[in-house]
């Protein structure tokens, strides 16, 4: 259970960082 939760948390963090980076790139590109 803990491993599952940890994996899910890591995946969520990676996705969040990726989305944030893409958003910053798009924003700086448009700006």
Curated annotation (Swiss-Prot):
CDD domains reported for this sequence: Sarcolipin
Keyword tags: Endoplasmic reticulum, Membrane, Sarcoplasmic reticulum, Transmembrane, Transmembrane helix
Single annotated GO MF: enzyme regulator activity
Localization per Swiss-Prot or TrEMBL: Sarcoplasmic reticulum membrane; Endoplasmic reticulum membrane
GO CC annotations on file: endoplasmic reticulum membrane; sarcoplasmic reticulum; sarcoplasmic reticulum membrane
Species of the source: Mus musculus (Mouse)
Side of membrane Cytoplasmic, spans: 1-7
Side Lumenal, residues: 27-31
Job description of the protein: Reversibly inhibits the activity of ATP2A1/SERCA1 and ATP2A2/SERCA2 in sarcoplasmic reticulum by decreasing the apparent affinity of the ATPase for Ca(2+). Also inhibits the activity of ATP2A3/SERCA3. Modulates calcium re-uptake during muscle relaxation and plays an important role in calcium homeostasis in muscle. Required for muscle-based, non-shivering thermogenesis.
Tissue expression as described in the entry: Detected in both cardiac and skeletal muscle (at protein level). Highly expressed in heart atrium, red gastrocnemius muscle and soleus (at protein level). Detected at lower levels in the extensor digitorum longus muscle (at protein level). Expressed in slow-type skeletal muscle.
Quaternary structure, from the entry: Homooligomer. Can also form heterooligomers with other sarcoplasmic/endoplasmic reticulum calcium ATPase (SERCA) regulators ARLN, ERLN, PLN and STRIT1/DWORF. Monomer. Interacts with calcium ATPase ATP2A1/SERCA1. Interacts as a monomer with ATP2A2/SERCA2; the interaction decreases ATP2A2 Ca(2+) affinity. Interacts with VMP1; VMP1 competes with PLN and SLN to prevent them from forming an inhibitory complex with ATP2A2.
Transmembrane segments: 8-26
Signal peptide positions (record): none
Keyword Lyase in record: no
Protein name, entry field: Sarcolipin
